[in-house]
Regions:
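N-terminal low-complexity, acidic/polar interaction/targeting segments
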Residues: 1-195
Length: 195
């Protein structure tokens, strides 16, 4: 993925933060968001998703959205009754949402990809071990006798991906998830997820 600014269709999300490397399903119902998905499908299947601060707003402004979002690749799209589309997406990279170029017929934004910052590998490893232990305990409480979720996350060697995957999986408030998405320091991000 390029590190220079780019223009992509954008979907404001209600109640969810999508992280890089996370695969999730999104049900899209807002007309402008459905149009953004169609525009992405007609081009290269990439779009930007970012969380709304207030879910009740129908047409959020730049200030009413998270300043950091995620470029996602649409892997699958299914049309549902009532004009809703369900998309299976995979997070690609964090982006700063620089400007909204248009809101009709769909949101289009200029975004700049953001790189994670490795400050102290030893500190990252320490937080990672703590997080591994806490996540294993959480999985045991939520889904006893299964290693599936644990293996998926623990299989990654990347501390940044660990923090993002676990922040997406464990129950956290939307504001906390958005703060984790906005944090570029991997050590601080791991610490935020550890709680």
């Amino acid at each position: 993925m390029e590190t220079k600014p780019m223009t992509l269709p954008m979907v404001p999300l209600r109640g969810i933060v999508v992280f890089p490397k996370v695969v999730t399903q999104l049900d899209i119902g807002r007309t402008t968001s459905v149009q953004a998905v169609k525009a992405a499908m007609d081009k290269d299947q990439y779009l930007v998703v970012t969380a709304q601060k207030d879910e009740s707003i129908e047409t959020p402004t730049l200030e009413e959205l998270g300043k950091v979002g995620t470029i996602v690749k649409i892997n699958q799209m299914l049309r549902l009754p009532g004009g809703v589309v369900s998309i299976l997406v995979e997070g690609v990279s964090r982006v700063n949402v620089d400007t909204i170029l248009s809101t009709e017929p769909f949101y289009e934004a200029t975004v700049t990809p953001l790189e994670s910052i490795h400050e102290d590998p030893m500190e990252e490893e320490a937080y990672r071990r703590i997080l591994q232990s806490k996540f294993a305990q959480w999985v045991e409480v939520i889904k006893p006798n299964t290693d599936e979720g644990l293996d998926h996350v623990l299989g990654s060697a990347d501390a940044s991906e660990w923090a993002d995957q676990i922040a997406f999986l464990v129950p956290l408030q939307l504001k906390v998830r958005q703060s984790i998405l906005e944090e570029l320091s991997i050590s601080r991000r791991l610490n935020m997820v550890v709680g």
